[in-house]
């Protein structure tokens, strides 16, 4: 079989073997490469996190085993820029936590943001996540609603404002709305607290729908 995958994570298996988590045309998969951590092996460095690889492989015991690497695009080089590294890491973590199935439009979205030059990785990540929800058919309704007061309650089923639900700061919802609406969203300054709480509520919303 042949497939194209993004490398999301790799770990050492034993002393010299490599185990990597990939996302691509077969969904989210685990790859095993015997002696993959030996630098004299020809595939050493191929399965670096963030690289895009096209491989010929077979499946064994729930793992995919590469027969050959047909093509590799070393997106890991982009991670030398710390802001791009943060954005790629945020996206990889989201896919690792939540996405198991393959969707062509979703894969294209991930690649587009992986290749994006960013000056504001937190704002870019929120933009990615809101696009992710739209691609999956879960775009929250609060993005088109007027948010007032100091706090609001969010209905996780529809993502709309409600008299009950998850309590969220109105300023945070308005921040997400602004990022959703603006083309020049990278100009928006994201405080650490806003990023952490915004990420938490978006992941909670996505988890609610994926686990129904």
Curated annotation (Swiss-Prot):
Pfam families: RecO_C (PF02565)
Gene Ontology CC, one term: bacterial nucleoid
Signal peptide (UniProt feature, chain positions): none
InterPro entries named among the record's database cross-references: NA-bd_OB-fold (IPR012340), RecO (IPR003717)
Gene Ontology biological process: DNA recombination; double-strand break repair
Name of the protein: Uncharacterized protein aq_2203
Organism whose genome encodes this protein: Aquifex aeolicus (strain VF5)
Lineage of producing organism: Bacteria, Pseudomonadati, Aquificota, Aquificia, Aquificales
């Amino acid at each position: 079989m042949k497939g194209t995958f993004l490398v999301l994570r790799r770990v050492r298996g034993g002393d010299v073997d490599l185990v990597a988590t990939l996302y691509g045309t077969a969904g989210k998969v685990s790859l095993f490469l015997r002696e993959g951590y030996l630098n004299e092996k020809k595939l050493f460095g191929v399965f670096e996190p963030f690289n895009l690889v096209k491989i010929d492989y077979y499946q064994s015991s729930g793992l995919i085993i590469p027969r050959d690497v047909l093509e590799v695009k070393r997106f890991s080089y982009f991670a030398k820029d710390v802001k791009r590294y943060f954005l790629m890491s945020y996206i990889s973590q989201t896919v690792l936590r939540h996405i198991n199935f393959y969707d062509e439009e979703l894969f294209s979205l991930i690649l587009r943001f992986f290749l994006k030059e960013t000056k504001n990785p937190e704002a870019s990540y929120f933009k990615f996540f809101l696009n992710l929800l739209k691609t999956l058919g879960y775009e929250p309704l609060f993005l088109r609603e007027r948010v007032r007061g100091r706090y609001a309650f969010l209905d996780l089923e529809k993502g709309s404002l409600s008299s009950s639900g998850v309590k969220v700061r109105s300023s945070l919802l308005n921040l997400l709305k602004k990022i959703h609406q603006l083309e020049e969203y990278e100009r928006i300054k994201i405080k650490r607290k806003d990023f952490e709480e915004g990420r938490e509520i978006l992941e909670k919303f996505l988890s609610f729908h994926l686990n129904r």
